[in-house]
Swiss-Prot record:
Recorded family membership: Belongs to the orbivirus NS3 family.
InterPro entries: Orbi_NS3
Name of one Pfam family that matches: Orbi_NS3
Membrane topology: Multi-pass membrane protein
A GO term from the CC aspect: membrane
TM spans (from-to): 119-139, 162-182
Domain of life: Viruses
Subunit and interaction comment: Forms homooligomers via coiled-coil motif. Interacts with host OPTN; this interaction inhibits innate immune response.
Name listed for the protein in its UniProt record: Non-structural protein P8
Amino acid sequence: MLSGLIQRFEEEKMKHNQERVEELSLVHVDDTISQPPRYAPSAPMPSSMPTVALEILDKAMSNTTGATQTQKAEKAAFASYAEAFRDDVRLRQIKRHVNEQILPKLKSDLGGLKKKRAIIHMTLLIAAVVALLTSVCTLSSDMSVAFKLNGTSAEIPQWFKSLNPMLGVVNLGATFLMMVCAKSERSLNQQIDMIKKEVMKKQSYNDAVRMSFTEFSSVPLDGFELPLT
């Protein structure tokens, strides 16, 4: 009988210990002790650069549509600043170095196109003068205009009238040259405007990368001072 009581006591003790272990293994929702410790948020705060870039783009797209070249250059500069704010730090540096390498070439091409445009414009003026003179000479010969010199009337000589066919050919050639020069000048103007826009975009992008934001708590664009060389 005593051994039976001892065995029953041992069974009750083991059952009680097992229930205690199961109770401790449970996590109570209302128990503040079982809650994990609270930590300060260590994740990096989202950058405000995309918001600034969006505001710059909104500024570039508002108001006028860029009818003049100055307004188009302004919008290109705004777009470049927005692009600089939106790009990653490494991508900014890569674009900056590429822009520094390509800008001298663009400026050289721009100077060459301006010289070519000046030559074509001068040729256009000369052709216009030749076309005007030949037109006046041909018209005077056809109308047999007489000039009065010292009280005596002088008519255009016959040999000059015989030059009318040649003058007509010269007039036609000068007119055709004027048309070709005008078309070439328009094409050069478009190329020059495009290169000017590219130069403005690349210079604005580099300025945005180099810029130290005194109005933004003196924090540079990339978070550290960039060398200017």
